[in-house]
């Protein structure tokens, strides 16, 4: 009887079909002669490794002549897949061989069902392999270099799906392509002929281990030979590391290095045959914090967000807050001081007298609103950094019928030097009256921040609208550009606008109302740096929102730039219209 001796020392095919109970299976031997259903014996001729690579469909799938299996010294553990029980009945137990699943319906040698099954090309072409092919752990040295017929080593290309992949052009079984399925991650090959079933699968734990296999001994199936059958790019580029994107660079590790998939994806079965990794949506920018981080942030805001008298200036920040934009007011959001001095007109070629006139008209309107409705006459010498700095002295009394003109607060303020920059506190009664006024200012601001015309009255409303239009025309819509960026930030649920200005708090509130900024600046987010400076205001803001959020400072002056540098905050300088447009563009692209 002729023997077939293949290149691998671990896999020899020998034996005879004379045994009535079928072939004897040893640890590294198996019969090379097969029996057909009519009882005839088919013998295989000795082949070299290069000849076996070109064997066509009339070669048996059971004779192991395919070089991808014959020369790979496959362990006898998976050989039960090539011994259909209807051909070689045997009652002899083989403990080293896994039992054949009952659902396996393999056809006998020589029948045409294999060709029919292999022609079901669509069953294989639509299955992307999410990890190592066939559920087998890394082939070790096989991935680093695969021997071809010529003996040269080739690297596995990232565009090639696996050594035994099936392409759409395989109409006949190729040598070494065994009629059983390989376990995929969440799926298996299944055709109408029932040859490939999900239960009939091989995993790494059942038959493949490094001690039994000589992985680099695959001499055939060069990757260039069947390159046309492989999908050119089965994996999206963002799921591959940069070190493996070149098909010509050998790798010392496994060729396919996929990034860690999101949790919950690895255990899901592939139910859609056309499913790809591209269906996984990465988290949106910016990334949300975990629940524990948000709880800690909330507790930080409650415990540390208090003023110098241990009062809470504002509600605790939103648990999802991730970015805080700290704005300057004059010459950043609005053009006001440079109108009064005429510097804006000189810079942009406008008429200086017209510019100064518009500035004076706006200044008069600002202080008129502050004096008439915001108690500026009473509070000018009792300026605060934040609207809630004196809220701890408020007893919550109903102010609907309270008469601010007759409570004696102005006389007490002028006769006693109680409103000092150092925050010296007066009597309890006087401090309560001060707190009443700031509470009333807060109520007016929240009521009219979207309807300043209702606060001014019909006559002043028309003058205000006319003045706003003239200033916008002179300044080339500076405020409109700033409002676009402010509104975009305000529309985000994880961002907030903060205003820090060197103007006193009450005139600053009047400016915000008259320039239509109340909708993007809640009164709790407005700080006056008149007494303590912007750097100290930045420290208060950090204490309020915590250090886990990202702070961005936007302004035109040196003071805010130095404060931002000290606290390691990014600084966006505003010196022209183009800076405002660039800021809005960066916000639209979510760079900020």
UniProtKB/Swiss-Prot annotation:
Q: Where is the composition biased (Low complexity)?
A: 8-26, 64-75, 241-253
Q: Which UniProt keywords apply?
A: Activator, Chromatin regulator, Cytoplasm, Deafness, Developmental protein, Disease variant, DNA damage, DNA repair, Hydrolase, Intellectual disability, Magnesium, Metal-binding, Nucleus, Protein phosphatase, Transcription, Transcription regulation, Ubl conjugation
- Record flagged with keyword Ubl conjugation: yes
Where are stretches of biased composition, namely Basic and acidic residues?
Answer: 288-303
Recorded hits in Pfam families, A to Z, give: Hydrolase
Q: Which residues are listed for Mg(2+) binding in this entry?
A: 328, 330, 556
The top EC class, named as a word, is hydrolase
List locations, semicolon-separated.
Answer: Cytoplasm; Nucleus
Question: GO CC terms for this protein?
Answer: cytoplasm; nuclear body; nucleoplasm; nucleus; protein-DNA complex
Assembly and partners are described as: Probably interacts with SIX2, SIX4 and SIX5. Interacts with H2AX in response to DNA damage. Interacts with SIX3; promotes EYA1 translocation to the nucleus.
The biological processes this protein is annotated with in GO are:
anatomical structure morphogenesis; aorta morphogenesis; branching involved in ureteric bud morphogenesis; cell differentiation; cochlea morphogenesis; double-strand break repair; embryonic skeletal system morphogenesis; epithelial cell proliferation
Identify the tissues in which this protein is expressed. In the embryo, highly expressed in kidney with lower levels in brain. Weakly expressed in lung. In the adult, highly expressed in heart and skeletal muscle. Weakly expressed in brain and liver. No expression in eye or kidney.
Q: Which GO terms describe its molecular function?
A: histone H2AXY142 phosphatase activity; metal ion binding; protein serine/threonine phosphatase activity; protein tyrosine phosphatase activity; RNA binding
Q: Where is the signal peptide?
A: none
Using the UniProt record, give the first listed, main subcellular location. cytoplasm
| Gene3D superfamilies (UniProt xref) | 3.40.50.12350
Q: Where is this region: Disordered?
A: 1-95, 240-320
Q: What family is this protein classified in?
A: Belongs to the HAD-like hydrolase superfamily. EYA family.
Q: What is the effect of changing residue 426 to S?
A: In BOR1; with cataract
Identify the catalytic residues.
Answer: 328, 330
Q: What is its EC number?
A: 3.1.3.16, 3.1.3.48
Quote the disease note of the record.
Branchiootorenal syndrome 1: A syndrome characterized by branchial cleft fistulas or cysts, sensorineural and/or conductive hearing loss, pre-auricular pits, structural defects of the outer, middle or inner ear, and renal malformations. Otofaciocervical syndrome 1: A disorder characterized by facial dysmorphism, cup-shaped low-set ears, preauricular fistulas, hearing loss, branchial defects, skeletal anomalies including vertebral defects, low-set clavicles, winged scapulae, sloping shoulders, and mild intellectual disability.
Q: Which organism is it from?
A: Homo sapiens
Q: Which cofactor does it need?
A: Mg(2+)
Name recorded for this polypeptide: Protein phosphatase EYA1
